[in-house]
């Protein structure tokens, strides 16, 4: 076996055609080719799957039972395989407690830094907290109170509610005679208690003494006597002692723990878990460390105040039903000479407060309604309390989904979104608490960490140096992959696929592993051209540690920087799955594969000869301040192809996906998603609908497929129902569905396969032995159109189906639209779980294309080129250009220069990411923006336009 290479022999997974591939060890290798050509099948479903299988096989049979199905990929042999780590583009963690800081473990080091080197301040007085040894406390008391009468007390309760009967009894049994309650010294008596609903401060009187030497007593003897008393007080007071001057009544606190010398407030000794919002020790008690709390949103409870309550104005209650809650509301309204038919906007606020938050007195229900001999009086707690009871009492998924319609997440009023309790937020280093550091951009935090050592004391510096060095090293890896605009408190769930992938990449570089095979799926997603060089250098750094790096990628810079390229093709789907080239980038330039033709400029996506002027109308969005936006005003010219550009984190998604799109969705579809802050929008009446086409899956079960998503499967079933054989048998459309009983194969439930449980071995998926994977029973399959059964139709590729249904006008347009967006290779019945993000997006786009448009539609696409080859981009852009030619407006967020150069109008944002971004730098045609001196995008646009001009010459 050659140790210098990894060999894949006879790979046949999905559409791969028994291919052999050689990958040099310790190289940066790029797998490229058209979308659907088989790159991911080779990288993830063959190489990674086999690596995982071999790893799992080292476990015991018992352990393997818990690790799910790891069947052997369809490949003859893979030699030279190292341990494999896949870094995919999925946002894997939806847990609201997961942040950039916790994922990268930087926050763990930050917690350690604060536990060891931070200075504590009192959240009550702002004073620096102090702590003393027992000996120091005794010497300070002697110094301050020598010759004076003092009370020595042990603090027991600080500002807490309760009757404390057991505490008083316990102190009495220990022999104590006096207790101080809320500043007043009282004799301890049997059965003593306090008002349980009030906050109390309680101290037990340990001793009363005059600090003067008795007859024949030395100063040392006095000190020892005081030390015994102080030690007793500290044992009772959990490390604290309180001294009261008997003459003046002035109180002073001393403590072995951190303590406020003014108020006596005491902190526990700092430990890393005090600074964790995932620990009860550190989390804000109100929001439990989430930074947000769920509140009932009255706008969602009463979405339309023009309706009456009888018509369903109070959404959780719905329309009038003869139920107690409606009788109670009617009784309240009758006091104001109103009834359930009155529009909510006409009901006085006082009455609405009673309806929402509860009536002050019991309401009278007429005896006729409750079928009793007398009127019925009942307390009414209000709709809001009723909703809260449902929220807290119904733990079912359906119950949570129902109550979730009326809830909004708002910033916690106690910690103001900082997640930690007051004590944790009171520790500071160079004037900053841990939450303030977590809010900084990583670039800003890196600089702060570089300077902070100069502002630490000598002892602090010695403790902190190594921790700071580790934090800076980890931040540096994140900066190197273009994530300087993120902050440590950014939720993992809010990251794009590309961002979360690059975070995992940075984490792997930081782990310093060697002899590992890394497989990455398009790490350049969402990355501006400016940051591409840094990403490539990071991948090379991973390689130079002694690892092999495989990247599934379409980016030209990445291909040119690679050591080795494997080009899969020649086309996609059944026409792909072959190795059309493997070798160095220099060798590839001398071939004529489709990829090579784009790299050596034999083919190119042409810059249009002229830019559209639009229809002269526009949508104006003003005063946007969400996230990092700085009062952004923007005009979107209608009837044009608009591209929003800018470095990662500059505010593109905030402006379009989080502000504009929710505003339009609320306007047209009454969407509940709230837009980010803005002042006004004008021109919505100029469009008639908004269509958002993203890369989320078209379905999450194997039963979903392109035919069901586009709706063409309903038309196909209707066609089969209309056939003479189906009419004779009396078949209805449900007969041709694999989701309901009747026509499907009941042996496999319409899945086409069975899952065989192997107990201590992984489950095995085998084709159904009754229907042989066709999903339907024999009777259903006997109905044929042009000699093909419904199962045969689902097994057709889109290209085959276009020919097959060319004379069926109800079906052809929907299938043709799939072909038009470059998905001719997909099978109509292909499971949606096997589609890539780019394929899912194009299925959605095809679905929208097959619908009629009025020429007044706004289409919003976020990075539609993800997962697309140069030629796929050409096909996609041709489709989008046709939409604009019909009078529609297409708005794209994009980094890809092949898309940017086709724009009629560019909105460039920046200049940087995060806090240093959030501004519109330049707008206009690509030619106009290329002349701008602001930001990084103009230089790249200028370069690509000049290259296009040379290509035309």
Locate the predicted segments by residue:
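Conserved phosphate-binding elements of NTP-dependent enzyme cores
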Residues: 1-953
């Amino acid at each position: 076996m050659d140790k210098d290479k990894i060999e894949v022999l006879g790979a046949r997974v999905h559409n791969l055609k028994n291919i052999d591939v050689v990958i040099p060890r310790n190289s940066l290798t790029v797998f490229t080719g058209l979308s659907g050509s088989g790159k991911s099948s080779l990288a993830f479903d063959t190489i990674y799957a086999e690596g995982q299988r071999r790893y799992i096989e080292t476990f015991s049979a018992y352990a393997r039972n818990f690790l799910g199905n790891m069947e052997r990929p369809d490949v003859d042999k893979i030699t030279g395989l190292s341990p494999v780590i896949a870094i995919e583009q999925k946002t894997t963690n939806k847990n609201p407690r997961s942040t950039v800081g916790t994922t990268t473990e930087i926050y763990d080091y930050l917690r350690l830094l604060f536990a060891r080197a931070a200075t504590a301040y009192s959240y009550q007085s702002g004073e620096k907290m102090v702590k003393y040894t027992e000996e120091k406390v005794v010497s300070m008391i002697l110094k301050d109170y020598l010759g004076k009468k003092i009370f020595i007390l042990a603090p027991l309760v600080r500002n807490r509610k309760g009757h404390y009967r057991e505490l008083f009894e316990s102190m009495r049994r220990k022999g104590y005679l006096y207790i101080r309650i809320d500043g007043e010294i009282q004799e301890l008596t049997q059965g003593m208690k306090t008002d349980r609903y009030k906050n109390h401060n309680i101290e037990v009187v340990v001793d009363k003494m005059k600090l003067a030497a008795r007859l024949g007593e030395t100063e040392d003897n006095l000190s020892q006597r005081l030390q015994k008393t102080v030690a007793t007080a500290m044992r009772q007071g959990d490390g604290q002692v309180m001294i009261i001057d008997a003459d003046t009544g002035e109180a002073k606190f001393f403590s072995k723990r951190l303590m406020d010398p003014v108020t006596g407030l005491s902190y526990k000794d700092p430990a890393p878990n005090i600074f964790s919002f995932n620990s009860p020790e550190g989390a804000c008690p109100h929001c439990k460390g989430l930074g947000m709390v769920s509140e009932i949103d009255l706008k969602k409870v009463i979405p339309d105040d023009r309706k009456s309550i009888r018509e369903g104005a109070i959404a959780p209650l719905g329309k009038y039903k003869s139920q107690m809650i409606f009788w109670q509301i009617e009784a309240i309204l009758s006091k104001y000479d109103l009834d359930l038919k009155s529009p909510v906007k006409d009901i006085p606020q006082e009455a609405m407060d009673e309806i929402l938050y509860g009536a002050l007195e019991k309401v009278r229900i007429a005896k006729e309604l409750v079928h009793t001999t007398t009127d019925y009086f009942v307390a009414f707690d209000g709709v809001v309390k009723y909703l809260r009871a449902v929220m807290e009492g119904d733990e079912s998924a359906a119950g949570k989904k129902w109550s979730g319609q009326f809830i909004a997440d708002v910033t916690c009023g106690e910690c103001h979104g900082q997640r930690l309790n007051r004590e944790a937020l009171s520790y500071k280093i160079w004037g900053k608490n841990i939450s303030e550091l977590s809010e900084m951009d990583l670039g800003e935090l890196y600089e702060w960490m570089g300077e902070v050592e100069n502002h630490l004391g000598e002892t602090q510096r010695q403790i902190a140096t190594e921790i700071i060095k580790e934090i800076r090293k980890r931040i540096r890896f994140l900066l190197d992959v273009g994530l300087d605009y993120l902050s440590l408190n950014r939720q993992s769930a809010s990251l794009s696929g590309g961002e979360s992938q690059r975070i995992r990449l940075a984490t792997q570089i930081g782990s310093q592993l060697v002899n590992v095979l890394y497989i990455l799926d398009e790490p350049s997603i969402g990355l501006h051209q400016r940051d591409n060089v840094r990403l490539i250098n990071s991948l090379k750094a991973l390689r130079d540690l002694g690892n092999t790096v495989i990247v599934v990628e379409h980016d030209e810079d990445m291909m040119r920087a690679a050591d080795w390229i494997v080009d899969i093709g020649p086309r996609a789907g059944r026409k792909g799955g072959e190795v059309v080239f493997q070798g160095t980038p220099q060798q590839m330039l001398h071939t004529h594969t489709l990829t090579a033709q784009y790299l050596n400029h034999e083919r190119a996506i042409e810059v249009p000869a002229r830019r559209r002027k639009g229809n002269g109308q526009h949508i104006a969005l003003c005063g946007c301040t969400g996230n990092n936006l700085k009062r952004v005003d923007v005009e979107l010219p209608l009837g044009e192809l608009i591209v929003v550009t800018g470095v990662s984190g500059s505010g593109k998604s905030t402006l379009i996906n989080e502000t504009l799109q929710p505003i339009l969705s609320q306007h047209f579809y009454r969407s509940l998603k709230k837009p980010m802050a803005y002042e006004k929008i004008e021109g919505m009446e100029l469009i008639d609908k908004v269509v958002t086409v993203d890369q989320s899956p078209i379905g999450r079960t194997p039963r979903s497929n392109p035919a069901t998503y586009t709706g063409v499967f309903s038309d196909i079933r209707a066609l089969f129902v209309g056939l003479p054989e189906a009419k004779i048998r009396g078949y209805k459309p449900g007969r041709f569905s694999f989701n309901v009983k009747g026509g499907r194969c009941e042996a496999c439930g319409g899945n086409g396969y069975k899952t065989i449980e192997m107990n201590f071995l992984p489950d095995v998926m085998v084709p159904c032995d009754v229907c042989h994977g066709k999903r339907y029973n024999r009777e259903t399959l006997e109905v044929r159109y042009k000699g093909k059964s419904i199962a045969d139709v689902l097994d057709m590729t889109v290209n085959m189906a276009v020919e097959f249904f060319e004379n069926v006008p109800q079906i052809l347009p929907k299938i043709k639209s799939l072909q038009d967006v470059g998905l001719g290779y997909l099978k109509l019945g292909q499971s949606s779980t096997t589609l890539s993000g780019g394929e899912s997006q194009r299925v959605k786009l095809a679905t929208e294309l097959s619908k009629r448009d009025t020429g007044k539609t706004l289409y919003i696409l976020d990075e539609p080129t993800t997962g697309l080859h140069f030629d796929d981009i050409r096909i996609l852009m041709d489709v989008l250009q046709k939409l604009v030619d019909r009078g529609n407006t297409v708005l794209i967020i994009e980094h890809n220069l092949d898309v940017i150069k086709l724009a009629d109008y560019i909105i460039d944002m920046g200049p940087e990411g995060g806090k240093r971004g959030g501004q519109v730098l330049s707008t206009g045609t690509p030619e106009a923006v290329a002349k701008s001196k602001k930001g990084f995008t103009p230089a790249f646009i200028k370069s690509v336009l000049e290259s296009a001009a040379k290509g035309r010459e």
